[in-house]
Amino acid sequence: MSHPNPRPRRIRALCAAIGLLAIAGCNVVPPAQEDATRYFVLSGAELPALAAVQAPTGTLRIGVKTVRLESYLNRKEMVVRTGANEVRFEDYRRWADPLDAAVTRIVRSRLLAAPPVAQVFAEPFPFDQARDFDVSIDIVRFEGALGADGKYSASLAAVVEVSTTGAGSRIVSRKLFEAPAQAWDGEDFNRLAQLLRADVDLLAQEVASDIPEKP
């Protein structure tokens, strides 16, 4: 008397068990988590008011070189200085725009509003346009900072240089600009972005005041 071969049944049972495990595995895959990263800009939510178009009253032609950042600032993560030689990079708090471009844009806009100025060019400069002065800005601090008193503040410092152009160019002025410390709570990064924007506005005003009224 022949006995049925049990192997096919075992194989079918094994396949069924594997299938059940696969289905169960699909049900226990954790749901995708929301990205916790937040992005910030230096510009506010309000749109700039459009003023009536007027012919410029000034004659100066200014070139704004691309803003340079200390290497540790040249990144998307916002920076918090926690000691004299220690910084913390905020992986989930980032700048939406490159900082050099954002600061250049604000400074250029402020210079265009200065009465002695007729035109402002951003680097790379057009070959067919002469310039009276060039402005260079090296940012050495652009961060939240923890002070020795345990309190946080916004910190911006930059070296600003104004020079003439052409073959015989010379430096007209060179100074270290430090924005007044503004209190920050160390947690609200939207507020830190607002404070640093206010500091950039002060920097832009300083640059405008450094431009001589005549070439």
Regions found by a protein language model. Name each.
Residues 58-60, 74-76, 83-85, 91, ...:
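Envelope-exposed proteins and targeting segments
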Residues 100, 104-108, 197-200, 204, ...:
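Extracytoplasmic/secreted envelope proteins and their assembly/folding machinery
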Residues 108, 112-116, 144, 208-215:
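Sec-exported extracytoplasmic/periplasmic mature domains
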